[in-house]
Amino acid sequence: MKHIHILGICGTFMGGVAMIAKQMGYHVTGSDTNVYPPMSTFLEEQGIEIIPNYDVAQLQPAPDMVIVGNAMKRGNPCVEYVLENNLKYTSGPQWLHDHLLRDRWVLAVSGTHGKTTTTGMLTWVLEQNGLKSGFLIGGIAGNFGISARLGDSPYFIIEADEYDTAFFDKRSKFVHYNPRTLIVNNISFDHADIFDDLKAIQRQFHHMIRTIPASGLVLSSASEQSAKETLALGCWSQQQFLGKDNEWFAERITNDASHFAVFHHGEKVAEVKWNVVGQHNMHNALMAIAAAHHTGVAIEDACKALGSFVNAKRRLEVKGEVNSITVYDDFAHHPEAILATLTALRDKVGGGVRILAVLEPRSNTMKMGVHKDDIAPALGRADAVFMLQPEQLSWEVADIANQCVQPAYWNANLDRLVDMIVAKAQPTDHILVMSNGSFGGIHQKILDKLKLK
């Protein structure tokens, strides 16, 4: 049995690679500095040994292959040992391509926003239609309770991330995936720590599109200008578009999009009734329906499957309710995602109740201040705004507070920020916490303080 050792195993992607390798029959071990649930628990349940930190003893005797996570940098003791001793190494995306994806019909879900949700939807649609596909998702799939599976059908569904592959391969991860069905949800400027501008991101998408066969399919939105520009660089595959007067269209039946109609070539085909809200999620669902249709799933059957779809955690996830005040958690950390999430919540709760938006500017792009001027407008649907000033932020959140049209508050101390939120909160309020990190456990802190109010 060949031994694979993974550096940086506890990230969602690398943890998923580990689970798939284990299911393929490899002996899998790994290491990380951040060994914590849920990923550590999932891996241990699979019988995968996790070694804390990067002592080089973990590479003695040498494994057959070292898979290097994209968080690994030169100077890491294990990275230096691998290079010095000429151990065989590769990246996660390259390993997936060489050992798994080249033999499968790959359905890749790409785009700046909505990847995890759409990948989960597509996986569930195929599952409910008897196609037990493999999958690798950048979050814990709500219907499956795991983020990755080998699967036993020809299909493999993968969340196609534009972030770079490894310290030795600065191409986007998705360049390795060679999809036959590609969803391009949207292309916006993000990851300013590795991309200079939007054109640099579009170039990576173009490189992926160049690898799709002529019989393959690219799905994108007719209204998505950045995607159109990218496709104009060259596309040798079939293309289908979402939007009125295009192949695929969805129309809300209820304001919050928990019930919507699906149109194909202008004809209404089916309806979706589900426990998810937001026009952005209706759009995500339409992408999943169209991609599933490419594999032969009937539109009506895809719509029926979505009725029992459970979203990944951290997508407008209710964390608790105290004194008729509801606290939500959401992964939104880009102005476009913040606006979409707030719009979805506003459509759900209506205009007669208050939404308190709580934001931690934590992502690398946020820290650099790239989207600083877009944050206040994105928060426009909230009745009040609360922001944390992280130590490592290069700009002042007070500037955003001053730009907000609604009351806006900030603090550099998490506990003081919690006190400010709780002091302003009233029964029937909806408190929406947005961050791509744990935000210091602020959700539970708010709920605990509300109980004492």
UniProtKB/Swiss-Prot annotation:
Gene Ontology biological process terms from the UniProt entry: cell division; cell wall organization; peptidoglycan biosynthetic process; peptidoglycan turnover; regulation of cell shape
Superkingdom, natural source: Bacteria
Residues binding ATP: 111-117
Cofactor: Mg(2+)
InterPro entries: Mpl (IPR005757), Mur-like_cat_sf (IPR036565), Mur_ligase_C (IPR004101), Mur_ligase_C_dom_sf (IPR036615), Mur_ligase_cen (IPR013221), Mur_ligase_N (IPR000713), MurCDEF_pg_biosynth (IPR050061)
Catalyzed reactions: UDP-N-acetyl-alpha-D-muramate + L-alanyl-gamma-D-glutamyl-meso-2,6-diaminopimelate + ATP = UDP-N-acetyl-alpha-D-muramoyl-L-alanyl-gamma-D-glutamyl-meso-2,6-diaminopimelate + ADP + phosphate + H(+)
Transmembrane segments: none
A matching Pfam family: Mur_ligase_C
UniProt keyword Methyltransferase present: no
Metabolic or biological pathway: Cell wall biogenesis; peptidoglycan recycling
GO molecular function list: ATP binding; UDP-N-acetylmuramate-L-alanyl-gamma-D-glutamyl-meso-2,6-diaminoheptanedioate ligase activity
E.C. code: 6.3.2.45
Disulfide bonds: none
This protein's UniProt keywords: ATP-binding, Cell cycle, Cell division, Cell shape, Cell wall biogenesis/degradation, Ligase, Magnesium, Nucleotide-binding, Peptidoglycan synthesis
EC category name: ligase
PANTHER family: UDP-N-ACETYLMURAMATE--L-ALANINE LIGASE-RELATED, UDP-N-ACETYLMURAMATE--L-ALANYL-GAMMA-D-GLUTAMYL-MESO-2,6-DIAMINOHEPTANDIOATE LIGASE
NCBIfam families tied to this protein: mpl
Protein family: Belongs to the MurCDEF family. Mpl subfamily.
Function: Reutilizes the intact tripeptide L-alanyl-gamma-D-glutamyl-meso-diaminopimelate by linking it to UDP-N-acetylmuramate.
Protein's UniProt name: UDP-N-acetylmuramate--L-alanyl-gamma-D-glutamyl-meso-2,6-diaminoheptandioate ligase
Species name: Haemophilus influenzae (strain ATCC 51907 / DSM 11121 / KW20 / Rd)
